[in-house]
């Protein structure tokens, strides 16, 4: 009897039907949309999903997967798995992105985003702009303003040793359904067997599944830094090092979870969709904000596969932190050999004046000398010189021109060309594509110190748009620039960027020194969409 009761309890605990019902309700439109693009129709029903899961658990169906033939039922299961990974891929800490001024969004989005603005910024919804230009590079503001307060830096590159069993080990913390985990394992093994083949064998669903596996691997490493911050707070692991410090100097700040991509800002429907999932993840799954405590200065930044952890501490603490990270990688993430992990601890003060490459951007280290003279009553103290180190971010214009040359918008020397494949679109649609392309480049590089050099890139896009329209209407470029196109739209006015838009990537409670940057630039900030 005891065994029967335990079996019933385990069956009710592992096989939760409400999970499948929830996934079907939230993914019905997505699966239907993808099924139409792949020229097949999948009727979504709870019985069909359970039937597909039962077939996937049989041995003779696993051989079908090895041959590379996915039926309609497996395509539906693959879509459901991808959406199920959305709940798992919610970052432990992320950033909020305020919208543009000219666009209107629901009040719920405004209340969730405008929780704490930077002291250098003003509320954009009151018709005011920021006092200084910030963009995606505002995540690097700590390099310019606060990096001199940190004396040691720990850096590493994430080596994606993606194995199906490692991903399943991570998923088990969030999903308790044995059948669904078994589906994960079969699909992941099927994907890994086809990684060495040509990309033509993959479809959109498989690409999304591979990207989800990569994100799960990276977010698990981000969770390690969040847990280690809490251990520093409790002074359990690092008590011998932090013993001289007083606990009263720690001040608590809360990092709220809210993540909106750049594509979501441009599309209101996707924006509402992400807000809904954010509320659902907080209420139903109980994800609460994580409390962090600052100690001196601490900064964590991850961009794609490179992460940086800088703080104000001694060398013993940083080496201990690096040792714990390497042990976490070897025991938890499957890197059984230390030569896969190369965490480096070096002194920031040893950075030279030459240009270096950090996280894919050019960084230049400058030194400023401040002359200080103190006078007490009639006594004048000797003159002292304070040396302050700054790190500047440069925008390589030749790389931008090279990217435009790749998409046939200009020559290798920067001479504008017409876009032949866009001549089949309407006039407004052509201008809108060039406008979005220009705004995306400006937003990305507006945080650099030489952002004024982007005016040359603006001229390239402007004349490339004019040449595309001239090629379409069989006229000259001068006539296109001087006359108005459809709906009284002038190209000179469309590409006028006097209004300064900005994207803030600051956290709540800006006055604190703690910074945790979670940047996912992979497949989110593209120069243009595929034709």
Swiss-Prot record:
**Where would you find this protein in the cell?**
Plastid, Chloroplast
CC per GO annotation: chloroplast
> What biological processes does GO assign it?
mRNA processing; RNA splicing; tRNA processing
What are the recorded GO MF terms, alphabetically?
Answer: RNA binding
Q: Does the keyword Plastid apply?
A: yes
Cysteine pairings via disulfide bonds: none
Q: Which UniProt keywords apply?
A: Chloroplast, mRNA processing, Plastid, RNA-binding, tRNA processing
Q: Which Pfam families match?
A: Intron_maturas2, MatK_N
The record's comment on protein family reads: Belongs to the intron maturase 2 family. MatK subfamily.
Q: What does this protein do?
A: Usually encoded in the trnK tRNA gene intron. Probably assists in splicing its own and other chloroplast group II introns.
- Protein name (database record): Maturase K
Q: Which gene encodes it?
A: matK
